[in-house]
């Protein structure tokens, strides 16, 4: 599958996100798909918790160190969805990336070591992980090279996050900007026992 043609990005993607409330923690998932409800079903979200809302409303649930898993799910670009974990430890990438879907997971936690790197999944399996402190590039190497993104040049959390966000903008065909942030999405709660066996 070829990547989309990208628009010009806001240069400092991370500064834009952190200035809108994500400076303590950001956990974002980009996954191929066009049906947010289907993604929520795969995540075993509680359908009764569904709330269609804007960014300002969603951020009322932003509690990055809570154990309650709250996600905001919506369309990112044609054939791509985005899931922001507003609360909780983050989602399991395996099930969402099943059936050939590409998935990227990016996490930043100011209180727990900063940037946790960029993970790439496809067909339910990890296909690459890159970070300043760990490096198993795998299939990510091709994407970094194709889009001329040099993550090795990052000297701090901000520049590292920017390199990943720019790569994701190129791959998905959409960068983060005001229109992206203000697009309505759907809030869901994932029950504590959703992944209990």
Task: Name what the model sees in each region.
Residues 2:
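Long, contiguous binding/interaction regions
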Residues 5-51:
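N-terminal "first-domain core" detector
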Residues 7, 23, 65, 73, ...:
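Intrinsically disordered, low-complexity regions enriched in Ser/Pro/Gly/Gln/His and often acidic
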Residues 10, 26, 57, 68, ...:
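Acidic, low-complexity intrinsically disordered regions
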Residues 11-12, 120-197:
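Long, compositionally biased intrinsically disordered terminal regions
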Residues 39, 95-96, 168:
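Broad structural signal for hydrophobic residues in well-ordered alpha-helices, predominantly aliphatic
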Residues 45, 101-102, 149, 170:
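Short aromatic/hydrophobic-glycine micro-motifs
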Residues 51-132:
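Short, intrinsically disordered low-complexity segments
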